[in-house]
Regions:
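Short inter-helical turns and helix N-cap capping residues of alpha-solenoid HEAT/ARM repeat scaffolds
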Residues: 57-59, 88-93, 97
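Conserved interaction-surface patches within small, structured recognition/assembly domains
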Residues: 47-59, 67-68
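Amphipathic alpha-helical scaffolding segments comprising HEAT/armadillo-like alpha-solenoid repeats
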Residues: 2-8, 17, 42-53, 74-86, ...
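Structural detector for internal amphipathic alpha-helices that build alpha-solenoid repeat scaffolds
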Residues: 2-12, 21-42, 63-74, 94-114
């Protein structure tokens, strides 16, 4: 199974949920799938396959990938979260992505569990 591909599918599905205002239950379902695939990828030492996606134009995908890679590349991911945390609707952020900003702020404040993903 191509875990990188599975992770990206989940990221795109999560973004779709936000854009279309769908249920957070669906959003969280894809989070669980994404996390499980990332756990396997990281345990195989292949987390670097996700690094290019930290540069995605999608704020949602950058946030998801930074969350998955946080414990492997903490300083890099913190810089992504800092960048996202400063985004506002007034500076061009689409309103549907405000939850992404909120989670970035929370991660900067509280961190991510050491055993994640």
């Amino acid at each position: 199974m191509n875990f990188t591909s599975e992770i990206l599918k989940c990221c795109y599905k999560r973004e779709e949920v936000l854009k279309n205002g769908l249920s957070m239950t669906i959003y969280n379902k894809y989070f669980d799938k994404m996390r499980k695939s990332a756990h396997i990828l990281v345990s195989e030492g292949r987390q670097d396959e996700l690094l290019p996606y930290l540069g995605s134009e999608s704020v949602s995908i950058r946030r998801d990938i930074a969350g998955l890679l946080y414990n492997s590349y903490p300083e890099l991911c913190k810089s992504i979260f800092r960048e996202i945390s400063e985004m506002t609707v007034e500076t061009g952020l689409q309103k549907c992505y405000t939850i992404v900003v909120a989670t970035a702020i929370d991660i900067l404040k509280y961190g991510i569990p050491k055993d994640f993903p």
